């Protein structure tokens, strides 16, 4: 048996790889094993399976999403632990890049083989490998693997089923504490009986939980005050006293409501206490550091350790330590919506059901808020790791927002035209360009994304040539710019998507709707959205705040916030004047009578225009420039690029006079339908696959064209505007012909022009339908039921899934971070907040 297959078998025996993982399938390749291991998560779990607590998994990033920085950190943690706790020699270890870049996967197999022969591993009773004489480094098998590895592959969620979950441990402690005395159940329970059980469980678990908070205060806080400093007490117990006070009152009102006829006022208690439960925001954001500080104090001081054991004995006969009990409040606040969900299910009266659903929504919102606090704590840990590794950084990285992507690239700039190897960290607000020095990074430049835009450039791309895939990062004023080069086209696409997402977070759609000026903002206190009244989630940059009136809002709610009360009274008039001024400027340009020029050589601001002139004008070959200032004896002209509507200066030797070419014969193309009405297009496309399209000549105006495309079960129509010999569907970009326009949108999503149309032009309507569905259909993905979106949700990251109210989402799994599910809609896959959807919604219609 090949050595890598023996290694796979050993990893399965060690309970690291699932027995059914695709690496075990017939026809599996070694690159699939490399892909499974290269983020370092499973390797760290392997050491813990062989030697419990060998690695503190809180120091491991369990969801690195192929961030090179985080993956390498995980791999190096594995390697150092192999030496320190398993006795492997340095010569037996692979280098971190041998795995991450798959430069020498044979050496990785060699290290795992050496690990399998260590006494610790053999004590587990698992057969080491190789079990027969085999070559430990088969160059034929392992050579060329780096070219087969996919840097853009999505995480295989099933892989992480074998990874320890601290949340699951906390859940077990909670369940043990809340276990109810068994009550005999009737042989056949009615819906009324089930409802009574739900009500009883809500009351009894609340009583037990409030007792637990009281026990922490009575048996741990008070005795430890004589041993610990006030700051230690505050760090460890956070606001437990406040939680106990809130729940003492909550329990009283809960009992009063349950004692009433039919418990019809129960929902009011939960709605009332949603705001009071916001004290959990502080607790949940600090409980992890509280546990860590408790461990440090107990390790450093034997008297404290002994006192903790004594307190535990008095509180619960030693069953639960203080560290165990500190996890319980986090678990409890995440259970209310589950308890109410069961109660809703078994409530028959329509009015009661609707009222309880209001309470359910309130508790779901609270749970999601808590989950986002936990998620942001993980994000802040990542940011801290970045911060500690970057030298010359003069401010907190958290000020730049959430990390988007990081990795190696090549770069050129206005100052330095030769390609330079760099390592970049992209966050919401900035790109940090660094030089890698071993395990640390030297900051070379910080690019503030507020004043930059991204522009694709595929002119020099070659599929088989690495580092030829490039896009531009250009300053709005043209004084500075960068060319960013990537190893593969897929990697470039991934980075471009993250740049676009970051810029859309800075300048979201509807940021200036209704007179507002919304900007990303970190709220110190837990805050509700002005539009939907749901909580803003997380611990930093939770949403947006209007610069003028201070109104808070979710990204997806910006267009629904009531009008701003703080902008100038002549706000609308100013906008109208600006519009009229622009029209007058356009008319003036047309009356000058200057010729149009065609670009034959690109220009991106190098060399820059003379200082007294103004901003440069970006030019691409084929662009048409309408001159506004031009004199034959001057080398610099001013003009408007009709493809982008930008105005600026450029060297006159990059253009020549524009000459209209002969009309194109469109009938040869499989997408061209000739003269056709909307109804005719709908008749053709209605029963075709999503993504099928045609281009038609408009019957009412034969000089105009339109695209008709099937998307999301509907036929959409897009008008193609023509003027000055150019074709466009948006003011941002123009083309010299229909063919160029169609070819561009075959490769680029229409969402850049129409937010709700996230598709390319995929299948020309004249192609046979069988070819149009030759790709694996989206429906072939295994899913576990569906859910209906109850609210809009706007993705903040390329891993998230934007939703519109009413969307039906296929649920792919619920195993991710708490409060987030993975789903598919319209062929797009990503994560979304579970409280924004209603699962099996048909039951509640």
From Swiss-Prot:
Modified residues (Phosphotyrosine): 826, 844
Presence of keyword Membrane: no
The DH domain, residue ranges: 194-373
Pfam families: C1_1, CAMSAP_CH, PH, RhoGEF, SH2, SH3_1
InterPro entries to which the protein is assigned, alphabetical: CAMSAP-like_CH_dom (IPR022613), CH_dom (IPR001715), CH_dom_sf (IPR036872), DBL_dom_sf (IPR035899), DH_dom (IPR000219), GDS_CDC24_CS (IPR001331), PE/DAG-bd (IPR002219), PH-like_dom_sf (IPR011993)
GO molecular function, one term: phosphotyrosine residue binding
Function description: Couples tyrosine kinase signals with the activation of the Rho/Rac GTPases, thus leading to cell differentiation and/or proliferation.
Domain text: The DH domain is involved in interaction with CCPG1.
Subunit relationships: Interacts with SHB. Interacts with APS, DOCK2, GRB2, GRB3, DOCK2, SLA, TEC and ZNF655/VIK. Interacts with SIAH2; without leading to its degradation. Associates with BLNK, PLCG1, GRB2 and NCK1 in a B-cell antigen receptor-dependent fashion. Interacts with CBLB; which inhibits tyrosine phosphorylation and down-regulates activity. May interact with CCPG1. Interacts with CLNK. Interacts with THEMIS2. Interacts with NEK3 and this interaction is prolactin-dependent. Interacts with ITK. Interacts with PTK2B/PYK2. Interacts with HCK. Interacts with PTK2B/PYK2. Interacts (via SH2 domain) with SYK.
Descriptive protein name: Proto-oncogene vav
Lineage, highest ranks first: Eukaryota, Metazoa, Chordata, Craniata, Vertebrata
Gene coding for it: Vav1
């Amino acid at each position: 048996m090949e050595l890598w297959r023996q290694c796979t078998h050993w990893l399965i025996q060690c309970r690291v790889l699932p027995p059914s993982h695709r690496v075990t399938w017939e026809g599996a390749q070694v690159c699939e094993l490399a892909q499974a291991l290269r983020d370092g998560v499973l390797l760290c779990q392997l050491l813990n399976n062989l030697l419990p607590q060998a690695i503190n998994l809180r120091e491991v990033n369990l969801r690195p999403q192929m961030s090179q920085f985080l993956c390498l950190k995980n791999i190096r943690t594995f390697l150092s632990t192999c030496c320190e706790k398993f006795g492997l020699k340095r010569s037996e270890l692979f280098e971190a890049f041998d795995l991450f870049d798959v430069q020498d996967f044979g050496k990785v197999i060699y290290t795992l083989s050496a690990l399998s022969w260590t006494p610790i591993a053999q004590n587990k009773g698992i057969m080491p490998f190789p079990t027969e004489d085999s070559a430990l480094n088969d160059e034929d098998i392992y050579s060329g693997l780096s070219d087969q590895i996919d840097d853009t592959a999505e995480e295989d969620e099933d892989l992480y089923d074998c990874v320890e979950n601290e949340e699951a441990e906390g859940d077990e402690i909670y369940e043990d504490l809340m276990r109810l005395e068994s009550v005999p159940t009737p042989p056949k329970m009615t819906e009324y009986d089930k409802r009574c059980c739900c009500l009883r469980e809500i009351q009894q678990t609340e009583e037990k939980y409030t007792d637990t908070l009281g026990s922490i205060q009575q048996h741990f806080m008070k005795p430890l005050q004589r041993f610990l400093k006030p700051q230690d007490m505050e760090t460890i117990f956070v606001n437990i006293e406040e939680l106990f006070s809130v729940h003492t009152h909550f329990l009283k009102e809960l009992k009063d409501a349950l004692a009433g006829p039919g418990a019809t006022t129960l929902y009011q208690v939960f709605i009332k206490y949603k705001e009071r439960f916001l004290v959990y925001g502080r607790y949940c954001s600090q409980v992890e550091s509280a546990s860590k500080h408790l461990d440090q104090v107990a390790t450093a001081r034997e008297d404290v350790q002994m006192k903790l054991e004594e307190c535990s004995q008095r509180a619960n006969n030693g069953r639960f330590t203080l560290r165990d009990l500190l996890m319980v409040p986090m678990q409890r606040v995440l259970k209310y919506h589950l308890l109410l969900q069961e109660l809703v299910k078994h409530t028959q009266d329509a009015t009661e059901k609707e009222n309880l659903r209001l309470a359910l929504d309130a508790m779901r919102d609270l749970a999601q808020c808590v989950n986002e606090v936990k998620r942001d704590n993980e994000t802040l840990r990542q940011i801290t790791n970045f911060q500690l590794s970057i030298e010359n950084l003069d401010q907190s990285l958290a000020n730049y927002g959430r990390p988007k992507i990081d990795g190696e690239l090549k770069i050129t700039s206005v100052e330095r035209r030769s390609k330079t190897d760099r390592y970049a960290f992209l966050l919401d607000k900035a790109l940090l360009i660094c030089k890698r020095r071993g395990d640390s990074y030297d900051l070379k430049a910080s690019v503030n994304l507020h004043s930059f835009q991204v522009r694709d450039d595929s002119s020099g791309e070659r599929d088989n040539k690495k580092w030829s895939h490039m896009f531009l990062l250009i300053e709005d004023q043209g004084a500075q710019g960068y060319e960013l080069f990537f190893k593969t086209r897929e990697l470039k696409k991934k980075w471009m998507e993250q740049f676009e997402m970051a810029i859309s977070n800075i300048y979201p759609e509807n940021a200036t709707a209704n007179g507002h000026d919304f900007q990303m903002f970190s709220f110190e206190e837990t805050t509700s959205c002005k539009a939907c009244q749901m909580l803003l989630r997380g611990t930093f940059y939770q949403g947006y705040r209007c610069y003028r009136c201070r109104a808070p809002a979710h990204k997806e709610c910006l267009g629904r916030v009531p009008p701003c009360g703080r902008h100038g009274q002549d706000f609308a008039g100013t906008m109208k004047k600006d519009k009229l001024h622009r029209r007058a400027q356009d008319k003036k340009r047309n009356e000058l009578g200057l010729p149009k020029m065609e670009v034959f050589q690109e220009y991106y601001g190098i060399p820059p225009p003379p200082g007294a002139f103004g901003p440069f004008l970006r030019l691409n070959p084929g662009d048409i420039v309408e001159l506004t200032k031009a004199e034959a004896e001057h080398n610099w002209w001013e003009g408007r690029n009709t493809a982008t509507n930008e105005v600026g200066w450029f060297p006159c030797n990059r253009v020549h006079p524009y000459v209209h070419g002969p009309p194109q014969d469109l009938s040869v193309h499989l997408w061209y339908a000739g003269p056709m009405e909307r109804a005719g297009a709908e008749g053709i496309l209605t029963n075709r696959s999503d993504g099928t399209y045609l281009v038609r000549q408009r019957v009412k105006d034969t000089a105009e064209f339109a695209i008709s495309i099937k998307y999301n079960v509907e036929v959409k129509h897009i008008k193609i505007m023509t003027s000055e010999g150019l074709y466009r569907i948006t003011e941002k970009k123009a083309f010299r012909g229909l063919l160029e326009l169609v070819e561009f949108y075959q490769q680029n999503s229409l969402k850049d022009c129409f937010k709700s149309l996230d598709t390319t032009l995929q299948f020309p309507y004249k192609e046979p339908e069988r070819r149009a569905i030759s790709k694996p259909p989206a429906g072939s993905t295994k899913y576990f039921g569906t859910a209906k979106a109850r609210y809009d949700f706007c993705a903040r990251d390329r891993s998230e899934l934007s939703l519109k109210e009413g969307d039906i989402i296929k649920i792919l799994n619920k195993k991710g971070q708490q409060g987030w599910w993975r789903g598919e809609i319209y062929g797009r896959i990503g994560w979304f907040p579970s409280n924004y959807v209603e699962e099996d919604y048909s039951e509640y219609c």
